[in-house]
Amino acid sequence: MNGTTLNILSQNIDTLWVINCAILVFIMQAGFMCMESGLSRHKNSINVALKNAADFGVSVVMFWLFGFGLMFGTSYKGIIGTDLFFFKTNISEYQTYFVFQAMFVATAATIISGAVAERMKFAGYLIVTIIATAIIYPIIGHWAWSSSYLSKLYADVTTNGSSGWLTEMGFVDFAGSTIVHSVGGWIALAGVLILGPRIGKYSSANKGKFTGSSFPLAILGTLILWFGWFGFNGGSNGAMDETVPLILINTFLAAAFGLLTGLFISYITKKKPDPMYVVLGPLAGLVAITASCNSVDSVSAIIIGIIGCIIAIITSELLEKFEIDDVVGAIPVHLAAGIWGTVAVAIFSDLEILGTGLTRIEQFKVQGIGIIAVGIFSFTISFIVLKILNNFYPLRVSPVHEELGLNIAEHGAVSAEHDLISVLDKQSSSGDLKIRGPQDPFTAGGVIGLYYNKMMDKLETSEEEKNKWRNRISKEIDLAVIVQENFIPKRNLKKYPVKGITFPQEKYLEIFLAFIHTIIVFTL
């Protein structure tokens, strides 16, 4: 087998690896959907799921139209790409890279949905997604990942211009702790500040009422994200080489120790394992290690994961203290842990692997510049645009719709619980005991309806039995009145019904005398 054949085979293996990793990253979308739906209240879970599906479609379309060109097109002074719009090419490496990067832009967008859940309009969220994926993310991506990143992955592909200005400085973010996760976190922060907290979230009367609909679903989503993250970090290498095993083990260890750190902190602070910390811990570890998973050893990855979890939990508590309502903890996990992961590159990475030619202190400064630049651009642009948009088109749903739940208000998605409430309301107003609620052994509302119907069956039977005896007693009383009238025809005893009505005292005497008269007649 000659060198050319080996080279083609190697390229094909690399392409297959990146495609498989892109599929794994796509699966992360399902993980986000499960996690965010599980952490949202039941009345909003369908809305959250639909947003996760819709933002993926919007993200891919925007990336195809504008994003890829802005991010990887010929650079204008390292700030923005100027071509490759309406992406089209016959080069398989470019095609593969487009698919992989399209998964990344969808991830950045879906981070936002969880933070603003339960009160942002569906159409408003799609507008936010367009802004994030067509403008903010691609421009920032160009600064750090532009054509030089592509040429690093595929050395035989012609580059399209100079590198982004952050790349020229030596900024390193291997798989996107800042470029993907912090960008999504900054936009999410702008969104929640403009929207404000959910109605009653920080009222003492509602303490404990804002819990997720299903922690098992949320934890399942966390595990799916963990699984997909192997593709997220592994595919960023761009090739199936000796670096991949290190990337995967660092990814796994950071997440595992993040999880254990979350459990440990929950035992220390709450004396019990908190399911929310089980969600925050591994995800924070994964976000933190994303920037340096190819350039640190396993011990460093463990430290990065542990500190990432601690920072995420502290940030989560600070948000609660300042009444910044982030439904799923997107800001602590993706923004705070992402910043830490980017800083950790300068602290723990092997400088030879980084290949920037900078000292550790110089690398630290460059990483800081990158974090600040990305933060200012992402937050400022998103906050200004959303603030202006909110003045013309309110992004938040009405209080009535928020209380009702976005499943019904925005999608007309009627649940078993809503059907049961409607039945109870109709029954209370009509008094009809024959009305029955919805039954479904696979939903909470349906199970309640099943037992409610059993109770109503017994109540209806009891009511029928009561009516039966009431009618029988009434007939017996009528018969007794007829008998007495035959003995005392001049007296109208129907004026004195014996159906629980109290007679005046003088009437008792008349009835008693009539009774004595009847006995005397029978005796004679």
Regions found by a protein language model. Give the residues of each.
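Hydrophobic alpha-helical transmembrane bundles of multi-pass membrane proteins
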Residues: 1-427, 433-451, 455-456
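… and, occasionally, acidic/histidine-rich disordered N-termini of signaling adaptors
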Residues: 422-426, 433-444, 462-524
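Signal-transmission/dimerization alpha-helices at domain junctions
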Residues: 455-463
